[in-house]
């Protein structure tokens, strides 16, 4: 009999959180909500908690807790309100919780995701930064504590589904036998055909207008710059123990083929589906079984054709910078992510031009390369380097 799962949805008010709660609500016999967390939207968090019957909510500070309590309109008892990053990690590791959806955007989601892995949970990983900034630490925690790691990014979920049946270890230490390459697909975002010379005047609204996916503002900008795909390359390296030279990116504007695995015998296995995050979320929640997701079926006759092309690195310099960071090592990946978060925040606030996002990242990577060699053996090491990289980026006069 399938075990009933009590899920902590970290970052519940974002698009991944919404989709996760939608899938959970479709399977009340198998799935329930233990905890929710949010950073700012307390009205929405209160409505979600009332609808799903969460036992716990986690908020960042006392002011947010007061806003949550003021917004509560549920007929049932108010959930326990926990405050601060430490309680977020404790909630992710709580014995009452079986499964953690790690969907907090950015490095802020790293400590709780790592705590879930250290507690041996089923971790549904939608937070790229856990692997980009702390890949070796995170994968070691999965292996050493018997955690179950299921990637939720559509690309990595697709690769996971296309891997050999015997290669589904939670944290492999070598590439799966017979696998030659991983092919990550990318839509190309809203500027796939735009002249690079015209990108200087791009506005936040234009960058956030993704042609296929509904996403938050930060990840929408990352998709436009293809830094998002670069982070996914780094993530794929850790998830599947695949060296960078065996990971390729293809532009696929229809977003129907979510990624592919090429085998030594010439076979290429692909996972296709509608561009709806409920599909990989349902896969992660139900694994190894399949759950209804609420996503409509794919009609290939409607598409008629599927296109693929190589990415233009002049238009997408952030993708090239990501491959360079992966080749340079984990400290460079920490710096890459930190610089991007600072630069994208500045762009969204109107303080930085779109084309300067890549320049900030490049400058921070050059700064990191000149630092004394550092070994990232603990979460504190990672967070210290992250803070120093953010400080350097913020003081460039560019952000």
Swiss-Prot record:
Gene Ontology terms for molecular function: 1-deoxy-D-xylulose-5-phosphate reductoisomerase activity; manganese ion binding; NADPH binding
Signal peptide: none
Transmembrane regions listed in the UniProt entry: none
Entry binding sites for NADPH: 13-16, 127, 129, 216
E.C. designation(s): 1.1.1.267
Amino-acid positions noted as binding 1-deoxy-D-xylulose 5-phosphate in the UniProt annotation, renumbered to this chain: 128, 154-155, 187, 210, 223, 228-229, 232
Catalytic activity entry: 2-C-methyl-D-erythritol 4-phosphate + NADP(+) = 1-deoxy-D-xylulose 5-phosphate + NADPH + H(+)
Keyword field contains Zinc: no
Keywords from the UniProt entry: Isoprene biosynthesis, Manganese, Metal-binding, NADP, Oxidoreductase
Residues that hold Mn(2+) according to the record: 153, 155, 232
Keyword Protein biosynthesis set for record: no
Pathway(s) the chain acts in: Isoprenoid biosynthesis; isopentenyl diphosphate biosynthesis via DXP pathway; isopentenyl diphosphate from 1-deoxy-D-xylulose 5-phosphate: step 1/6
Cysteine disulfide links: none
Family recorded in the similarity comment: Belongs to the DXR family.
Function: Catalyzes the NADPH-dependent rearrangement and reduction of 1-deoxy-D-xylulose-5-phosphate (DXP) to 2-C-methyl-D-erythritol 4-phosphate (MEP).
Protein name: 1-deoxy-D-xylulose 5-phosphate reductoisomerase
Naturally occurring in which organism (per UniProt): Bordetella parapertussis (strain 12822 / ATCC BAA-587 / NCTC 13253)
Gene: dxr
């Amino acid at each position: 009999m399938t075990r009933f799962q009590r899920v902590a949805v970290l970052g519940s008010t974002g698009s991944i959180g919404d989709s996760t709660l939608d899938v959970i609500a479709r399977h009340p016999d198998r799935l329930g909500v233990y905890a929710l967390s949010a950073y700012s939207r307390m009205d929405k968090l209160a409505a979600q908690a009332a609808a799903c019957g969460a036992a716990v909510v986690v908020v960042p500070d006392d002011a947010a807790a007061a806003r949550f309590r003021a917004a509560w309109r549920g007929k049932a008892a108010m959930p326990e309100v926990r405050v601060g990053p430490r309680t977020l990690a404790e909630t992710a590791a709580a014995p009452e919780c079986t499964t953690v959806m790690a969907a907090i955007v950015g490095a802020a989601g790293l400590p709780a995701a790592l705590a879930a892995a250290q507690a041996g949970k089923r971790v549904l990983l939608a937070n790229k930064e856990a692997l980009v900034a702390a890949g070796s630490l995170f994968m070691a925690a999965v292996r050493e504590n018997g955690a179950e790691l299921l990637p939720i990014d559509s690309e990595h979920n697709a690769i996971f589904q296309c891997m050999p049946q015997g290669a589904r270890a939670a944290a492999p230490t070598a590439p799966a036998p017979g696998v030659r390459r991983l092919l990550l697909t990318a839509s190309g975002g809203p500027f796939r055909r735009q002249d690079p010379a015209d990108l200087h005047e791009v506005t936040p609204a234009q960058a956030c207008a993704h042609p296929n996916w509904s996403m938050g503002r930060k990840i929408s900008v990352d998709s436009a710059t293809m830094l998002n795909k670069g982070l996914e390359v780094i993530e794929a390296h850790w998830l599947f123990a695949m060296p960078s030279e065996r990971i390729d990116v293809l532009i696929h504007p229809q977003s129907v083929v979510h990624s592919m695995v090429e085998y030594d015998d010439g076979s290429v296995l692909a996972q296709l589906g509608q561009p709806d995050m409920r599909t990989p979320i349902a896969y992660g929640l139900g694994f190894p079984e399949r759950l209804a997701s609420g996503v409509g079926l794919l009609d290939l006759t409607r598409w008629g054709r599927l296109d693929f092309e190589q990415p233009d690195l002049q238009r997408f310099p952030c993708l090239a910078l990501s491959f360079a960071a992966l080749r340079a090592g984990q400290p460079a990946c920490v710096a890459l992510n930190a610089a991007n978060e600072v630069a994208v925040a500045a762009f969204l606030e109107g303080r930085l031009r779109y084309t300067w996002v890549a320049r900030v990242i490049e400058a921070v990577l050059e700064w990191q390369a000149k630092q004394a060699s550092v070994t990232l053996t603990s979460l504190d090491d990672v967070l210290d380097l992250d803070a120093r990289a953010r400080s350097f980026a913020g003081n460039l006069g560019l952000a």
